Amino acid sequence: MTKKWTALLLAAVLAVGLSACDTSRAEAPGSNLESGVSAIEDAMTKRNETESSSFPAGSDLRIGTSADTVATPDDFPAAYNYGTGKIEDYSRTAMLQKMPEPVDNATVLNTSADPNHIQALYLWEEGNVPAKTQFTAAMTGYFDNWDFRPYVTAIPVRTGVQPKGAVVLMAGGAYQFRGNYTDSLPTAAALRELGFQTFIVDYRLSPYTQEEGALDVARAVRFVRQNADAYGIDPDDIAVMGFSAGGIQAGEFLMHYDEDVNGTALDESYVPDALDAVPAHASAAGMIYSFYGRLSVGNMDPDWLAEGDLPPTFYVYGTEDPFYRQFRQQYDVIRNMGISTGRIVLNGWPHGFGPDGGWVNDYAAWLESVFANKEES
């Protein structure tokens, strides 16, 4: 079986039912997890009707390679072993694997940042998590249990490496699961080897809403900014990036929940704490087979996009992705709005390739340039 068709059958689950699992159905039964996975596995075997042969000449379109894909680093604990990071080695088991949770109620407020070790911290204090969705013990079958608390996992650069900035990552999964071991974790490892401090957000999924997840992203960005000195970075050198639904989640944060917006925007009972005084500001965005908008639908309205005062944005997608045309169209809209952009298009690649394809180094170089010239952006 070729790499492309292996990807179509397996890696596609990262998109998880972008058309089958709309987040507007917050009250849908938890069985949507399995039905969504199955639906997307079936849907992703269908070829996309692309016009890749007539793609404009330039350096954006490429064949794609696994030459630079990073396998699990030798200093990662066993619990963070994701394998080779290559699309051909993906499996449903890996895609549904969960990241280790924090221990001893360690939170971003009660625990000091550790720039020398992988560290998992809850994003919110117990009993003070802003929410508008009632998720109860009687609601079963979801990826997360009803008492799930969002958390961030910091993956710092190797000792002795001068950090170039920070990247906050969100996995895909159409709000039905988080594919950390197939996209965000191996990508974080690759960016870490290139000198970036990385932070993976385990944000809230269904039955929670996109808006609630955006607050989790904002909280993680605040944590990174507050601890910029500890991580050896400029507090303004922070990017957010996401894969599929994770990119949509990053976009929701940038459009409506960044800067000074806190949990009270959704939940009047939320009590702001010291971390809320830190602006949730990101200087760049990465849309990896994703777009600004909602599940399945990228927003192409320049007036709406302008409301978000969006930062420079980098797009990565394949020509065999069912959402190829939407990615391409939004990239053109964003660029025509005067927003600084970057792009890699992998010819013949599907949805859900994670860090594979040879795009991470280009993204890292683009990010360095954005950080160096952010005053002009």
Task: Name the predicted role of every residue range.
Residues 164-172:
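Short beta-strand element of the alpha/beta-hydrolase
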Residues 219-308:
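Primarily recognizes the serine-hydrolase "nucleophile elbow" in alpha/beta-hydrolase
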Residues 315-317:
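Short beta-strand/loop motif that positions the catalytic acidic residue
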Residues 179-181, 201-232, 353-358:
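Catalytic nucleophile-loop/oxyanion-hole region of alpha/beta-hydrolase
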Residues 17-20:
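C-terminal motif of bacterial Sec signal peptides marking the signal peptidase cleavage site
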Residues 328-331, 335-377:
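C-terminal catalytic histidine-bearing segment of alpha/beta-hydrolase fold enzymes
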Residues 181-199:
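Short amphipathic alpha-helix adjacent to the substrate-entry channel of hydrolases
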Residues 58, 64, 70-161:
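N-terminal cap/lid segment of alpha/beta-hydrolase-fold proteins
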